Amino acid sequence: YFDIFIEQKKESQSVKKDSLQKYIRIHNAVLELEKNEKTTYYLRSFDKSFFSRFIKHLRVKKEISDNTLKRKIGYFKSFFNWCIENGYQTNTAYKKVSIKARETFHVSLKDKEVDTLAGLELDKALDYYRDLFLIGVYSGQRYSDYSRLDRKFIDGNNIVIRAKKTGQFSYIPLNKKLKSLLDKYDWNFNLIASQKFNIKIQKICKIAEFDEVIQIDKFYGNKKVSKDVPRWKLIGSHTARRTFITLSAQRNVPKSLVMQATGIKSYKTLENYTRLDIDKLNQEMFKAWD
């Protein structure tokens, strides 16, 4: 049934390539456990015991953290919902499967770091990827959107674009820095997969010496694993969007306007993007308590 499910997803124009790959990886993980257990799974096999073993397999054997596991189980549940919608009899134990999400540390760049990136002397290839990242910083969009900005989206002093992920419209002010970079490439970009783009951006940020060591905690059930990593390793395509939102907040841009520019529909989601300004925190707290 999973093969049929994946084939239908392939034929659906509404399913992105990245999402399709996630369904395939879940299927492969199930097949791997099936092989390890030397058994054959049927729809009725996916009971409480199976999910306990499957989650343990992903945590222990595949070293998948709880936050990633939660997303994977979400994709797996889509398969079972599809089964029910199509009249296939399946075990309903999946409905009670729940993985606790853990707070995740995300990076956004400071004003001076954005300026540092903009001023770096780089070779032609890295110069292009740096500029594309800065387009994300100046526009506040996801990589899937800021990498496809086009003149046809211009409406007066704004770029109006519908997000690929959510279908929501963003009204992006065509500020001088953004327009300068878009014009530099004649609004025409050669795209690479976001994972490869992240590697390029991390290389650039390493050159920029964003070397501050940060402790990252990952949870695997009740097990916590802490690891020290340089800050540049935590920077990726989505850091651009977080940076736009965080710097807009620090510049006192009203939240409602930031939401219109980014296509974000809820204040809760917006707050999740906004990173702590530790310098501002210290300044205000020292003023209050010293």
Which residues does each predicted region cover?
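N-terminal core-binding DNA-recognition domain of tyrosine recombinases/integrases
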Residues: F5-D18, H27-F105, G119-L120
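Residue-level marker of regulatory loop/turn positions in helix-turn-helix DNA-binding domains and
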Residues: L43, T68, H106, K124-D127, ...
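Residues within the helices of the helix-turn-helix
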Residues: K56, N67, F133, S144, ...
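Basic, Lys/Arg- and aromatic-enriched nucleic-acid-binding interface segment
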Residues: D66, K70, E85, Q89-Y143, ...
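Conserved tyrosine-mediated DNA breakage-rejoining catalytic core shared by Y-recombinases
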Residues: E103, D111, S139, R148-L181
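Short, polar N-cap/turn motifs at the start of nucleic acid-interacting alpha helices
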Residues: K152-N158, L234, Q250-N272
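Catalytic-site neighborhood detector that most strongly recognizes the C-terminal catalytic loop/helix
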Residues: A163-G167, T262-K287
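Short, basic (Lys/Arg/His-rich) helix/loop patches that form interaction surfaces
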Residues: W187-L191, Q202-Q260
